[in-house]
Amino acid sequence: MAQFMVTAAYTDSAFAGMANNPHNREEAIGKILSALNMNLESLHMTLGGKLFMVVSGSAEAAGSLRIVAGASGSVTDITVDEVFLAADQVDWMQSASAVMGAYKPANA
């Protein structure tokens, strides 16, 4: 399964809801992910009011997650980016090295 980094900023109304009804957001997020056949790898909050999580699943599910989160109205500035292990970069570098001479930049 692919992994995705999801970030978002809570709205003021979301903060009001959490202050008026303290609860574990991981449980609520887990329900959405389960419905999308995704897994929560890690969930973090920042002091600046941002949500940061790593999830695994399909690209289709990740796209759906973006729509569901946006439609909720409780978060803004949502990003969903596929992430890779740093070790994967070696393969990318080797592949790039093999084709560098074949590419002619537009400004050349």
Where are these regions (language model features)?
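An amphipathic, aromatic/His-enriched active-site/gating alpha helix that lines ligand/cofactor pockets
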Residues: 58-86
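Conserved beta-strand core positions
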Residues: 4, 51-52, 76-78
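Short beta-strand-to-loop capping motifs
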Residues: 8, 54-59
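A structural preference for short, hydrophobic beta-strand core positions in alpha/beta folds
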Residues: 42-43, 80
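Sterically constrained small-residue positions within well-ordered secondary structures
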Residues: 44-45, 71
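Amphipathic, hydrophobic secondary-structure cores in small proteins
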Residues: 45-55
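Short S/T/G/P-rich N-terminal loop/turn motif that feeds into the first structured element of a domain
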Residues: 1-35, 39-41, 48, 63, ...
